[in-house]
């Protein structure tokens, strides 16, 4: 979304195609401007459906996207002439090829993770993984001579415990490697100095990060609406006095973990801003979190919000410490704003 807004601010008209599952939440989370056209197509199925979800992505969505582009280009003055595909949706590159459109792929991953997905055939050939994507050795390996050594934790399919689902996911990544290779190049949310060995040895990966690029006229869409009171609260705090805690858009904490963080924050006597998403406050956690928030509000040393503009928060002079799950986007946000990761938080 950051890349789309940057392109729109530089004169391009954007048609942003999303799944129905995410569409309404992104549209309602923020404005996108008159150069944006937000469209959804059926995602096919929910994430709990496992292999069927992968089948829907691989076999159902390509025809839906192709039909959508045919319809727009047949009826609309603003025809689609260029396609930017999510790297993990390599089939969209093949759709563009069939329709005679130029295309590139975009990856929100680190260049190292991206290079791993582009090296599946080579990793099989060199004996690092077997035909089903399982590591054949516990030894670490390198994707380039001077790159950091990595292990199987970089394999996006290997975290699945169900063997059938893991193998199905691996087949998808195998097919995706072949499809996405047809893109002219792959743009990546990283920068040259951060992962130089990868960019040197994978010339088709082009760094364009860290995103966002410059100032955009509209906020990038998220799945949650920003709580703007977080900045108002930070404005009232002394310089370098606040601990900021946020664990991304997917990671969840159980009640024991929430209690441990709450106890640590209380013991530290530090001011803090803590992001706890609404989907973490349902069910068994709801009463506990309500009590926690009431207690924090009474003491006046902290604030809990559902979501906030992380870049604005990290750029605020009151922030002294950033505690995160060390996802790639959060890592880059921290680096941009002088909050460097410790040791091996991201390899």
Label the model's feature ranges.
Residues 1-347:
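Glycosyltransferase specificity loop/lid
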């Amino acid at each position: 979304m950051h890349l789309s807004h940057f392109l729109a601010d530089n004169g391009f008209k954007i048609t942003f195609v999303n799944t129905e599952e995410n569409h309404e939440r992104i549209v309602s989370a923020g404005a996108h401007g008159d150069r944006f056209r937000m469209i959804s197509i059926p995602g096919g199925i929910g994430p709990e459906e496992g292999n069927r979800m992968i089948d829907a992505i691989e076999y159902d969505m390509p025809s839906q996207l192709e039909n959508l582009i045919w319809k727009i280009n047949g009826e609309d003055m603003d025809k689609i002439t260029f396609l930017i595909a999510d790297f993990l949706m390599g089939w969209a590159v093949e759709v563009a090829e069939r329709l005679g459109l130029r295309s590139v792929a975009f990856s929100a991953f680190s260049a190292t993770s991206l290079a791993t997905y582009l090296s599946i055939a080579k990793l099989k050939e060199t004996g690092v993984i077997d035909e089903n994507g399982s590591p054949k050795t516990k030894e670490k390996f390198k994707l380039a001579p001077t790159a950091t050594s990595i292990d199987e934790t970089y394999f996006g399919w290997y975290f699945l415990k169900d063997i059938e689902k893991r193998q199905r996911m691996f087949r998808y990544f195998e097919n995706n490697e072949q499809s996405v290779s047809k893109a002219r190049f792959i743009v990546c949310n990283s920068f040259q100095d951060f992962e130089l060995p990868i960019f040197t040895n994978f010339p088709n990966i082009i760094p364009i990060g860290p995103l966002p690029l410059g100032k955009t006229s509209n906020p990038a869409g998220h799945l949650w609406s920003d709580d703007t009171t977080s900045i108002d609260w930070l404005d009232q705090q002394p310089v370098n006095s606040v601990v900021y805690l946020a664990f991304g858009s997917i990671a969840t904490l159980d009640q024991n973990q929430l209690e441990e963080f709450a106890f640590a924050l209380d013991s530290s006597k530090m001011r803090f801003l803590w992001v706890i998403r609404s989907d973490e406050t349902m069910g068994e956690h709801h009463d506990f979190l309500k009590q926690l928030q009431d207690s924090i509000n009474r003491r006046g040393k902290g604030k809990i919000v559902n979501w906030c503009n992380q870049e604005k928060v990290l750029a605020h002079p009151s922030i002294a410490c950033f505690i995160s799950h060390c996802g790639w986007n959060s890592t880059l946000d921290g680096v941009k704003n002088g909050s460097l990761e410790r040791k091996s938080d991201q390899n």
